[in-house]
Amino acid sequence: MQQATAPKISFVSLGCPKALVDSERIITRLRAEGYELARKHDGADLVIVNTCGFLDSAKQESLAAIGEAMATNGKVIVTGCMGAEPEQIEAAYPGVLSITGPQQYESVLEAVHRARPALHNPHLDLVPPQGVRLTPRHYAYLKISEGCNNRCSFCIIPKLRGDLVSRPAGDVLREAEKLVAAGVKELLVISQDTSAYGVDVKYAESPWKDRAVRAKFLDLASELGELGAWVRLHYVYPYPHVDEVIGLMADGKVLPYLDIPFQHASPDVLKLMKRPAAQDKTLDRIKRWREQCPDLALRSTFIVGFPGETERDFEFLLEWLDEAEIDRLGAFKYEPVAGAPSNALPDQIADEVKQERWNRLMARQQAISARRLKRKVGTRQQVIIDEIGPTVAKGRSKADAPDIDGAVYLSSRRPLRVGEIVTAKIDRADAYDLHGTVAGF
């Protein structure tokens, strides 16, 4: 008798690293139950689309992905942030099998079971102990909480993902330990508000090895720094207690890197945005951080053309950037999001003004980036290898997160391996990237 084949699932993951972690969790459960992953929609038994609903452009991308899955397969399960408001999906594609919001893993699995039951009962040893990941083997995203307590006027994340829910520190550390044991060299700590970690549970302790660890930003970062991997901190709001973690960076416990979404510098615009920690002494703090940890790299995102942003506000931002010298910057032109309070603000900015300001901001940042990278020429930097090319290898320094920051291009007389961390001599720099040779050869 011919043995039945395992059902195959095609998976599309859209949006931010938090959504990617959600996708990894769903896939890990499916693999544990005997489902296989298909590379293409046609030939798969089902397609799961994990959507993004943060911006209208992201919603359009999600709808396009659903449409492609419906056209090439026809059996589609939708989950993720856009699924929290299913009306638009239902109107465009009434034939989808199921629609669920973010973090609703059990509902997704139930929908899969209804549409295509597994062949046998789950056995957890069918998957590796670290689970199934969608990133390269040498780095992994480590999500420490869900949701957000902030109510920024341009954001609907709390509406989609709820208020802050922190994971117990012991659970986070056990996951991190498994990842490192499986060969992960870099842990990228993510959440909606990493520096607020533990506020919702009043920094409750949980067991970890032979001791109790508080669910607190500093405590967790300190423990992660003992696992022997690079630890990179993302989505950190500039609350006063962030100052405490700079010492860990100066001591080499965690990477000297902070991803802080400042969004703007003008006090008036920050007030309209309803940003937390919107204080006017941020420049002083950045100066103190760099005095304590000279190698500190700062990444941030900014919004230009926010309703009410005047030319004076924008010039303030440019002058602030000149003084702050942010190492890595992402900029977005303000885009109305359905359900966001900022839609009702007066003095909306014309699209051509948004574009003009975005161009000026990026030109200013390009000069800042080139200036800061030039200072690294002649120095030695640790570099983690991401790709091996025919003539050079592509990697990242401690100042570069994957996908969003710059790269280091290296020549080497010996073969290099993906995931290897090497010491490189920096020979030259351009606006966003470094070029060098592996030291010692």
Swiss-Prot record:
Top EC class of this enzyme: transferase
Catalytic activity: L-aspartate(89)-[ribosomal protein uS12]-hydrogen + (sulfur carrier)-SH + AH2 + 2 S-adenosyl-L-methionine = 3-methylsulfanyl-L-aspartate(89)-[ribosomal protein uS12]-hydrogen + (sulfur carrier)-H + 5'-deoxyadenosine + L-methionine + A + S-adenosyl-L-homocysteine + 2 H(+)
Keywords: 4Fe-4S, Cytoplasm, Iron, Iron-sulfur, Metal-binding, S-adenosyl-L-methionine, Transferase
GO biological process: tRNA modification
Residues that coordinate or bind [4Fe-4S] cluster 1: 16, 52, 81
UniProt xrefs under Pfam families: Radical_SAM, TRAM_2, UPF0004
InterPro entries referenced in this protein's UniProt entry, alphabetically: Elp3/MiaA/NifB-like_rSAM, Methylthiotransferase, Methylthiotransferase_CS, Methylthiotransferase_N, Methylthiotransferase_N_sf, NA-bd_OB-fold, Ribosomal_uS12_MeSTrfase_RimO, rSAM
GO cellular component: cytosol
Keyword Transmembrane among UniProt keywords: no
MTTase N-terminal domain span: 7-117
EC number: 2.8.4.4
Gene3D superfamilies xrefs: Methylthiotransferase, N-terminal domain, Nucleic acid-binding proteins, tm_1862 like domain
Domain of life: Bacteria
Residues that coordinate or bind [4Fe-4S] cluster 2: 148, 152, 155
Cofactor, how bound (note): Binds 2 [4Fe-4S] clusters. One cluster is coordinated with 3 cysteines and an exchangeable S-adenosyl-L-methionine.
Main location, first listed in the record: cytoplasm
Residues of the TRAM domain: 374-440
Keyword Hydrolase: no
Molecular function via GO: 4 iron, 4 sulfur cluster binding; aspartic acid methylthiotransferase activity; metal ion binding; protein methylthiotransferase activity
Role: Catalyzes the methylthiolation of an aspartic acid residue of ribosomal protein uS12.
PANTHER family: RIBOSOMAL PROTEIN S12 METHYLTHIOTRANSFERASE RIMO (PTHR43837), RIBOSOMAL PROTEIN US12 METHYLTHIOTRANSFERASE RIMO (PTHR43837:SF1)
Protein family membership: Belongs to the methylthiotransferase family. RimO subfamily.
Protein name: Ribosomal protein uS12 methylthiotransferase RimO
Organism per entry: Rhodopseudomonas palustris (strain ATCC BAA-98 / CGA009)
